[in-house]
Amino acid sequence: MNSIGVYIHIPFCRRKCPYCDFYSINYSAGKADIYTEKVCSSIRYFGESIRRNADTLYFGGGTPGIIGADRLCKMVNEIKENFGFSENPEITVEVNPEKENIDFDKMRKNGINRISIGLQSANDSELKILGRLHNVKQAELCIDRAKSAGFQNISLDLMTSTPTQTKYSLEKSIEFCAKKDVQHISAYILKIEQGTPYYNIRETLDICDEDEQAEMYLFTVEKLKEYGYHQYEISNFCKSGYESKHNLKYWHDEEYIGIGTSAHSFVNGKRFYFPRSFEDFYNLKTVSDGEGGSPEEFIMLALRLSEGLTEKRYKNRFGESIPEVYKNNAAKFSKLGFLEINSDGIRLMPKGFLVSNYIISEILG
């Protein structure tokens, strides 16, 4: 049977950022100990029931790095014992730069081989407005320490169209990432989500309008290309061979198990998730989220990738060519330069990514 990806949600943060709508709570060592034990028992449960090796493991949050290397490595070893790892697994941990005592050496020695650092900006005033707890100097130190521990696969998160950001300051942030010679960069357009502090003060925030957001996004794509980072997904860029294997599972509509509060899963054709509740997670109470793996879902996810919806992948999955109706629906967008249709399939261009939700809904009819 095919390998599976594993996602573990670590919901702890020192302080919640004003733009963030992910599930998180304030960190305490006691809560982290209890949560770690519950994750480990869940790993044992799912390992027994799923019986598939893990080829990717991703610790997301929240702020996974905040709980320390000992707890993280304990969970890695539980996966190793109860799932088993495929050859050369990708094991990622998200960290924030403000925590200066992250034990990268221990992480590396226990099989963790990819670090994702929440930089967001290389401008101290922008970081302060974003409610981040680190400064640029701390971010640089964090990257250097990860490298010194032997990490050769480091990703940085950037945000575009943030309050007071200019094209010049964005260019400097991109330049910072490139000069640090990291392998992967995720660049996200700031979205003001309902229920966040930013949403409550949205009228007072100095942020870009939609046209300016589009300009900043396309500028980001071009600058990263100049520095040798190819775009492989709407918001993700990397040097050759350093695509996030775990995230590609989502976009290739492959199966994964999510463990922890708010974690989603796609296993044996079924989608389900844990609610945003410690009690429900501790009792392994999941909520069904319907069937997964339909042609429509496959197409929607594939079109997020720069390679797009390929004939090869579609045929391997469904045993037939991409239905002509989808190509016909895509034709008008090809004429407008938003996407490309050829014998290999359908793929969006960078300006098409900006309106991808609309284009994909039109293609699917």
Show where each model-derived region lies:
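N-terminal [4Fe-4S]-dependent radical SAM core
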Residues: M1-Y7, F22, I50-R52
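C-terminal scaffold of the Radical SAM
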Residues: S3, S24-F46, D55-E320
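Alpha/beta-hydrolase
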Residues: I8-I10, L119
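Local cysteine-cluster metal-coordination motifs and their immediate loop/turn environment
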Residues: P11-F22
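Short, amphipathic alpha-helical interaction segments positioned at domain boundaries
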Residues: K351-G365
